[in-house]
């Protein structure tokens, strides 16, 4: 991943295979393979146990190498949130991709049609006008696409919340050229971060009841509803066991982050931190304060500042563009100048989008660098 920016001067990669973790240039995004692989196995086993397909969400990582490993363990396909985001995954040979979002605009619809010609693509709709646009785009591209009617199961974002409209959209999708009605998108994003397990369980039950009622309405009207897709890392335990969902769209489970870490995880499903931002102590201006070289351009903070892994006496207190201010708590030892620390991002999805590559390590030794090739693909 070296890049020549001036003749004869190249930006070197952050690490080489065989390098110890302490030699990785910082700031860098690092994946620890042992907990990562354990997380993949745990979620796949949970889905298999409940006879639910796993369709991991690639918006979490934007990295085809990760998606390929999820598929190798048994995932049915993947989700992407934007049409452009799907491009690198199709290029990597992934053939079953659900765009878990509405697609609006001529350029994006044309791209959707191109992708649907070379891969099995599905997309969400929640209004008749957009459904007609998708149909026209598929006809122009000479393609077919599965459409799922998105229903609002409690988040209050996109999605239909009216029986008559759900039925009308499903009927319209059956009749229009270029599209096939495939089922329902029923995702509740807010519940993923409800802190107590009991609260998540109750809201998931409510969401499942809403999704089931729409599916029953369709079936009673003679319309098959083969797919009900949704769920996430925080709700997977309950969604899989509900008997309603046919697919789970969890993504962050592979990595975990500070926000998910704040949830109560005392049930049968739990995951480990596998993703870190590596940072170096660049300054020690006071006995109780050190400065790191990783700030907002290395890890996002909309869910709070990152945590410092394995260092309970160090607290990341302020985040700037390229600096992180760390308080050394009373009684704790300040790290040395040049010391390398592991940060746990508070939100993995946008943190991945800040990096070009992922340094992959096992037992503290670099194995590879994986390209985050869908970084910035947000159209």
From Swiss-Prot:
Sorted UniProt keywords: Lyase, Pyridoxal phosphate
Activity regulation comment: Inhibited by the carbonyl reagents hydroxylamine, phenylhydrazine and semicarbazide. Inhibited by the chelating agent EDTA. Inhibited by the sulfhydryl reagent p-chloromercuribenzoic acid, and by sodium cyanide. Inhibited by iodoacetate, Ag(2)SO(4), HgCl(2) and CdCl(2). Competitively inhibited by beta-hydroxyaspartate and O-phospho-DL-threonine.
Cofactor note: Binds 1 pyridoxal phosphate per subunit.
One GO MF term attached to the UniProt entry: D-threonine aldolase activity
InterPro entries: Ala_racemase_N, D-amino_acid_metab_enzyme, D-ser_dehydrat-like_dom, D-ser_dehydrat-like_sf, PLP-binding_barrel
Gene Ontology terms describing biological process: D-amino acid catabolic process; D-serine catabolic process
Thermal dependence, as annotated: Stable below 55 degrees Celsius.
Protein name per UniProt: D-threonine aldolase
């Amino acid at each position: 991943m070296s890049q020549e920016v001036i003749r004869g001067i190249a930006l070197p990669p952050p690490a080489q295979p065989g390098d110890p973790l302490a030699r990785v240039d910082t700031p860098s995004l690092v994946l620890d393979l042992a907990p990562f692989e354990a997380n993949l196995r745990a979620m796949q086993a949970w889905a298999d146990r409940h006879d639910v397909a796993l369709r991991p969400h690639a918006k979490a990582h934007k990295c085809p190498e990760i998606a390929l490993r999820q598929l190798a363990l048994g995932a049915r396909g993947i989700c992407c949130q934007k049409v452009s985001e799907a491009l690198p995954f199709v290029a990597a040979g992934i053939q079953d991709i659900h765009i878990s979002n509405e697609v609006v605009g001529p350029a994006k619809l044309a791209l959707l049609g191109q992708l649907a010609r070379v891969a099995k693509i599905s997309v969400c709709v929640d209004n008749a006008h957009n459904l007609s646009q998708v149909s026209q785009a598929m006809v122009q591209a000479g393609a077919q696409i599965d459409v799922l009617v998105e229903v609002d199961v409690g988040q209050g974002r996109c999605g239909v919340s009216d029986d008559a409209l759900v039925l009308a959209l499903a009927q319209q999708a059956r009749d229009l050229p270029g599209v096939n009605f495939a089922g329902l998108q029923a995702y509740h994003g807010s519940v993923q971060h409800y802190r107590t397990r009991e609260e998540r369980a109750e809201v998931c039950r409510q969401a499942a009841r809403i999704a089931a009622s729409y599916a029953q309405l369709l079936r009673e009207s003679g319309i098959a509803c083969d797919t009900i897709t949704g769920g996430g890392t925080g709700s997977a335990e309950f969604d899989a066991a509900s008997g309603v969902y046919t697919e789970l769209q969890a993504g962050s489970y592979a990595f975990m982050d500070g926000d998910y870490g704040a949830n109560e995880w005392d049930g049968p499903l739990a995951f480990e931190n596998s993703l870190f931002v590596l940072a170096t102590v660049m300054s020690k201006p006071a006995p109780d304060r050190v400065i790191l070289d990783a700030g907002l351009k290395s890890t996002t903070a909309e869910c709070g500042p990152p945590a410092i892994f394995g260092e309970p006496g160090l607290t990341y207190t302020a985040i700037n563009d390229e600096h992180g201010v760390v308080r050394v708590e009373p009684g704790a030892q300040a790290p040395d100048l040049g010391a390398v620390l592991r940060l746990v991002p508070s939100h993995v999805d946008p943190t991945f989008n800040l990096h070009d590559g992922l340094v992959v390590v096992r037992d503290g030794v670099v194995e590879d660098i994986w390209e985050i090739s869908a970084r910035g693909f947000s159209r």
